[in-house]
Amino acid sequence: MAEALIFDAVRTPRGKGRAKDGALHEVSPVSLAAGTLRALQERNGFAPEAVDDVVLGCVDPVKDQAGDIARTAAIVAGYGDAVPGVQINRFCASGLESVALAASRVKAKDADLIVAGGVEMMSRIGMGGSGMPVLTDPAIAMPNMMIPQGVSADLIASLHGFSRTDVDAYAMESQKRAATAWREGRFTDSVIPVTDRTGVTILDTDEAMRPETDMQSLGALNPAFEGMAKMAGFDAVALQAYPELEGLVHVHHAGNSSQIVDGAAAVLIGSADAGERAGLTPRARILSSVSIGSEPTIMLTGPVEATRRALAKAGLSVDDIELWELNEAFASVVLYFLQEIGVSHDRINVNGGAIAMGHPLGATGAMILGTLLDEMERADRKTGVATLCAASGQAIATVIERV
């Protein structure tokens, strides 16, 4: 079986996911995705026609994101008529799932060189814009005990004793780490500025960061999911699934949850032979990738099991992994992972995460993989894991090793 190598990874800066003041709102999703594809080609000099496929994650593929955005982006990026493209959706895990699918095809020798990644323009198409019957159809949601992710995050906090202070302290640290990373230029190599048609830069840094965040400002925010959970009966569903609880403690709000943003990312994956033919230098190999399903009410704890399986598949233990990236969907998700996996906080999300910089749903998985690889090189670390939870109880984890 062939190795699947990572040759490069790029991402756009994340723009605020709001129509009124998001810097990227006027950029089309196709253009944003095409920009990452074009950057990969220009940085590495491979012939576009050498690419066997383009695989992009997109969670809400409707309106401006509809019509197989991967194929359209490949055409717009100048990859030529012969390069196909496919859009996939595993909710928030979509960007990393695209990488896993690309790696599987390379390992199976079904393809030699693939661009994988994702795109999501949340300022144009809001979360759930493509419809989500697991939440909106009571005939599906109630019998299967489906609840919104924010309520699931509060359920995790309630079950495991994470207080409002705990989740706010984690959020504040994410903001501090992200601000430090940007100040020290840790994202410079992989973040490509977004420009307009005249070449003027529209955005070159993550727009949604709030480096001034402190415990006082976080403490002033009201819980975001309490009213909705009680009014719509989601608290009752959670307590039916977890009767050991007397009630839910709602601790999550806008300041300790992932931010709604626009963004795109792309990763160049291929075989050693393809790399040699194209003059590419490999940066890492993909050792394993595992996607799982887990209990859908609590929903967001899946990264623990996905990570354990991915490590077992790679023949490694937790102690063998030097750096970790876990998508900060909500603060309790990371606190639970730290508790169950036994990773110290100084080895995970060392440059901040989605609480500080945002979570462009279909792109985040590819983004955090690139962030992980950049930090592994900067800090001279050998092994890393990228992992995300996803809606309806899914999760993915990928293990990489520098070469």
Region locations from a protein language model:
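N-terminal amphipathic/basic leader segments beginning at the initiator methionine
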Residues: 1-17
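N-terminal extracellular/periplasmic Venus flytrap/periplasmic-binding protein-like
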Residues: 10-13, 25-35, 43, 169-272, ...
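Active-site pocket-shaping loop/turn-to-helix segments
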Residues: 14-38, 42, 60-63, 86-100, ...
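Conserved beta-ketoacyl condensing-enzyme motif
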Residues: 23-114, 119-135, 191-204, 297, ...
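Conserved catalytic cysteine-centered active-site region
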Residues: 27, 58-112, 132, 144-154, ...
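Active-site-proximal alpha-helical scaffold in enzymes
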Residues: 88-119, 157-187, 266-273, 360-381, ...
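Active-site pocket-lining segment
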Residues: 154, 190, 287-356
